[in-house]
Amino acid sequence: MTKRTMLRRAIARGGMSIAAGVHDGLSARIAQDAGFDVLWASGLGISAAHAVPDDSILTMTEFLEAARVMNDSTDLPVLADCDTGFGDERNVARMVERYERAGIAGVCIEDKVFPKRNSLGDGAQDQETIEGFAAKLAAAKKAQQTDDFVVVARIETFIAGGVKEDAIARADAYVAAGADAILIHSKSRDGLEILDFGRSWQRKDVPLVAVPTTYPAVTADDLHEAGFSLAIYANQALRASITSMRESLRQITHDRSSLRIEPKVAKLSEVFELQR
């Protein structure tokens, strides 16, 4: 089974899969060993690994290289976070050609204007017009060479302060333009607008994807009951690694020794195993 077929099966309506946000080959292998179904090549994670904001700073080539390493390091399908598609329809078409050629299973593009800002930060968010983003999706689908390559349309209506009716209108238009799945994003604390969207979505043949970063009390099972088939845990691995590295390194500088952290860190044999 190809990785693209694996991704299509993972997001198919009727089941519930989970994806881990990863930012390099090591985090990809750890996610695979933990039992995740899909890898999310996180734009935030890749940007953070380069110590730059998630604001369209890195180039497509840099994001693609990170996704390629993840793909080559594991047996799991990679769904790549491609922000707004790195430009207009021509840029989107080239992006699809490059990602598909690299073996990536699918891409996700969001309906914000370029350059984008991270959805969970402060400040206003500007959405692309429905027609403009639909044209990008159509260009993406026209550019793909294999039938099973996946293009996910990410809707930022709730992030931009919009209402469910706009989100559904956008979803309908994006599916008509060729989107294989819809990702609806939100930074609500309770996730109720996401669950409401899922229950209101009438296209039962089109998969729904959620990213429960700001509403962690909503479980994957809760999302499944509302009609979703993929939950992306987009940045938890990144945040966990920051906490662990910070605590360990501060302990070393305080003690002038690594003795007290040794029971808390991975053994070298575990590192070697991850380099298999």
Curated annotation (Swiss-Prot):
Domain of life: Bacteria
Catalytic reaction(s) noted: phosphoenolpyruvate + H(+) = 3-phosphonopyruvate
GO biological process, one term: antibiotic biosynthetic process
Pathway: Antibiotic biosynthesis
CDD domains documented for this protein: ICL_PEPM
Matches recorded under Pfam families: PEP_mutase (PF13714)
Record protein name field: Phosphoenolpyruvate phosphomutase
SUPFAM superfamilies from the UniProt entry: Phosphoenolpyruvate/pyruvate domain
Organism: Streptomyces rubellomurinus (strain ATCC 31215)
Entry annotated with the keyword Isomerase: yes
EC number: 5.4.2.9
Gene3D superfamilies the record matches: Phosphoenolpyruvate-binding domains
PANTHER family reported for this sequence: PHOSPHOENOLPYRUVATE CARBOXYLASE, PHOSPHOENOLPYRUVATE PHOSPHOMUTASE
InterPro entries (alphabetical): ICL/PEPM, Pyrv/PenolPyrv_kinase-like_dom, Pyrv_kinase-like_dom_sf
Family under the similarity heading: Belongs to the isocitrate lyase/PEP mutase superfamily. PEP mutase family.
GO molecular function annotations of the record: isomerase activity
Annotated keywords: Antibiotic biosynthesis, Isomerase
Purpose: Isomerase involved in the biosynthesis of the phosphonate antibiotic FR-900098, a potent antimalarial agent that acts as an inhibitor of 1-deoxy-D-xylulose 5-phosphate reductoisomerase (DXR), the first enzyme in the nonmevalonate pathway for isoprenoid biosynthesis. Catalyzes the conversion of phosphoenolpyruvate (PEP) to phosphonopyruvate.
Active site: D54
